[in-house]
Structures are given as C-alpha cells and as structure tokens.
Swiss-Prot record:
Keywords: Ribonucleoprotein, Ribosomal protein. This is Ribosomal protein eL22-like 1. It comes from Xenopus tropicalis (Western clawed frog). One of its GO terms (biological process) is translation. The keyword Ribosomal protein applies. It holds the Pfam family Ribosomal_L22e. The gene is rpl22l1. Disulfide bonds: none annotated. It comes from the Eukaryota. One of its GO terms (cellular component) is ribosome.
Amino acid sequence: MAPSKDKKPKKAWSFTLDLTHPVEDGIFDSVNFEQFLKERIKVNGKTGNLGSIVHIGRLKSKITVSSEKKFSKRYLKYLTKKYLKKNNLRDWLRVVASDKETYELRYFQISQDDESESEE
C-alpha cells in the first residue's frame, strides 16, 4: 500500500493596487488598466491565459489580483510601470509599495522651495 501524502492547503497569492489619487484627479482610467492587466499577465508563459488561475477584480479605485499559483508582486509592478509609460504618465506617477501586499500610485514630490527662489 502506498503511503498517503498530506495535501497542504493551497496558498492564494493576492495583491492590491491602490489607484485612488490619480483616479480621483481624472488622469488615470482604472477600467482601461484592468483590461491591460487581463491582456498582459502571463500564466505558464502565455499572455491572455488567465483561466481560473488568476483573478482580477476592480472596486472603484482599487484593483485586486489574486492567483492560485505563485505570483510575483514585482511582476505586477513591472506591468503597472509599463502601462504608465505607454500612456505617458510615467513622468508624473510612481509605483510605491505601501505594505507587503499593496502597491500605491503616488505623484512625484516636486519641491516648492526651488520654484519660489527662482521667481524672486
């Protein structure tokens, strides 16, 4: 008789992208970005092959990507930066990790001191 193998519960990988500030300002389209992710995320080396392995959900200005297989948070950042570059938003927005499972889009900080000195 073969020894029984203990099946470990599958770990679900889940990451969140917080797009609150750019969406409220009207410079970022979350619906378009969600579609971009669905088309570009690779599963088993093929794009557009999400199937039942990867799920992408959108709730107002937050996008959640959950996967049954191992999924890299860094890959999500790479795709976000690629989208920003494609839509000429890379000069104004950056992708920042706000915690272990969340990325946030923030504006670059432009110092006001430099501008006020040059005006005087």
